């Protein structure tokens, strides 16, 4: 990290790091670092369907410093424990953890443009799904409704 002047009160916030393996990201976050979790596409989410990401850490002050530097309000901080991956799976304890959800335009505050472009290329629109091939189901017996069907008879 770049040094700052001795009289300066501003220290640039840490940049969240992405990891190829989620377990490495969890370990980094549990040690107090900022982990940029992988993007996920959520069909049914709080802010509607789309790509979601998050910055995770066990250090709430470090996470808030990053958020404030991106004009994300402090109220965006959420509490969610982290798994202690250094323990056996059976009886694994949970460690204090925090995250800030990112969606829509906020994704560009943390994720590089190439990562966002690759994620959008992986998106599949409902119109491209083929009935009967299995890609129209997210679990057995559940079909995705045609978006033009809507509520009939209104």
Segments predicted by a language model, with ranges:
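Charged, low-complexity intrinsically disordered tails and linkers
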Residues: 1-42, 48
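Exposed alpha-helical structural elements
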Residues: 14-18, 62, 106-107
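Long, contiguous binding/interaction regions
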Residues: 29, 33-36, 41, 47-48, ...
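Terminal, regulation- and interaction-focused segments at domain boundaries
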Residues: 43-56, 61
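A short, structured beta-strand/loop element
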Residues: 58-82
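Short, compact, well-ordered microdomains
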Residues: 75-138
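Intrinsically disordered, low-complexity repeat/linker tracts enriched for polar/charged residues
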Residues: 137, 142-145
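Long, low-complexity, intrinsically disordered segments
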Residues: 145-154
